[in-house]
């Protein structure tokens, strides 16, 4: 599920967990700076050794991925002008990718655990603005 701003800019992507995956699901459009996929491997699959070559990229802002490992939370997404777009409930196994705009989350169950992955370097005093 893609979440767009009023100006048709991609703000976030949410993937709701499901057990049946045939092979690969690319969660991010190819043109986004943060790429994420879900990949199913069969037994004895071998990913050939490889190196990712140096490629210069320009990043503006921080992109984040949340993977809900347990519990439940409510994620709210905002336009860059701080206008609320929508809220979604995320449960165990769900993934949220934030490309731009604002966000917040509120835990709905005790012991909610997420993995948070973001591009860096993270500059604590300059990287976010609370509203």
Can you name each region flagged by the protein language model?
Residues 1-40, 88:
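A short, N-terminal "cap"/entry segment at the start of jelly-roll beta-barrel domains
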Residues 2-6, 106-131:
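Double-stranded beta-helix
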Residues 49, 75-76, 96-98, 103-109, ...:
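Short beta-strand His + acidic residue motifs that chelate non-heme Fe in jelly-roll/DSBH
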Residues 55-56, 81-83, 120-122:
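Short, surface-exposed beta-strand-loop junctions and turns on beta-sheet-rich folds
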